[in-house]
């Protein structure tokens, strides 16, 4: 669970994530969740921050273990769920260090070795389940899919006002480069700016808990945007409900399964090979 407030930047290791989720929390600040399939060349991960209720369910879509440092009161309701393989550094679930070059609570870092050790100690598999079905279906060809009828998209603003995040398309390499807080977003580990092949906007109803904290229900169905190769087009998404929690002052619907993405004609969305950012 990546910190994304200015005091916690730059992040370390995030450029090696295959999928990055970005969601808004209190005060308009966003948090990032990196999903890693291969972490062999990752030497540092951080800074790590606290969990919000929707992130463990997004991690479950990828059959992934979810690592965080603390949590909101609403997220605490789900952290004991055996279907959600969560690890809380604040409870000693994995080893970490507090770096001296940043102030607390923006200075918690760890390594992939620490995370794998934590999984082994809890007897959590580091391999995908045999019946795992990935949420995203990637193009089998390395040649990107062209969409002649899609709208041109060179600069893409996320709508997150706090960090003023946006992406700019580079026609030379076909990637979208990430900016926030008025400057390029850089991985401390590599020194390189974050860049992705695909961006998906998943539009969900924005509600609030009783104390004003954001409430996002990720089940049901809705619309979104798929952005790749300099174009943007409308898509649809859907996610099945597996349960309802009534302890949070609302009927909180949740699901462990994957989000399904389709084109506007309801055929399955095929995304280009490469890293993907989901907002």
Named regions from a protein language model:
Residues 2-21, 26-279:
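A surface/extracellular/periplasmic glyco- and lipid-processing/surface-interacting theme
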């Amino acid at each position: 669970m990546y910190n994304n407030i200015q005091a916690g930047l730059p992040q370390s290791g995030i450029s090696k994530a295959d999928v990055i989720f970005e969601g808004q929390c209190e005060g308009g600040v966003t948090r990032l969740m990196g999903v890693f399939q291969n972490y062999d060349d990752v030497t540092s991960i951080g800074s790590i921050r606290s969990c919000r209720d929707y992130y463990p369910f997004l991690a479950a879509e990828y059959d992934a273990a979810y690592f965080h440092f603390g949590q909101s009161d609403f997220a605490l309701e789900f952290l004991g769920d055996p279907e959600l393989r969560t690890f809380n550094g604040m409870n000693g679930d994995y080893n970490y260090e507090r770096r001296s070059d940043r102030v607390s609570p923006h200075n918690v870092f760890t390594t992939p070795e620490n995370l794998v050790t934590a999984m082994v100690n809890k007897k959590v598999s580091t391999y995908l389940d045999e019946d795992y079905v990935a949420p995203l279906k990637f193009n089998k060809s390395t040649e990107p899919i062209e969409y002649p009828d899609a709208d041109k998209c060179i600069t893409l603003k996320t709508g997150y006002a706090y960090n003023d995040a946006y992406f700019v398309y580079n026609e030379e390499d076909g990637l979208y480069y990430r900016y926030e807080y008025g400057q390029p977003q850089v991985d401390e580990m590599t020194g390189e700016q974050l860049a992705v092949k695909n961006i998906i906007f998943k539009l969900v109803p924005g509600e609030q808990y009783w104390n004003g904290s954001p409430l996002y229900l990720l089940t049901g169905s809705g619309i979104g945007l798929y952005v790749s190769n300099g174009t943007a087009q409308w898509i649809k998404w859907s996610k099945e409900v597996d349960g309802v929690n009534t302890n949070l002052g609302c009927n909180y619907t949740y699901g462990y399964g994957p989000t399904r993405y389709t084109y506007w004609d309801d055929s399955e969305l095929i995304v280009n090979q490469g890293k993907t950012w989901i907002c």
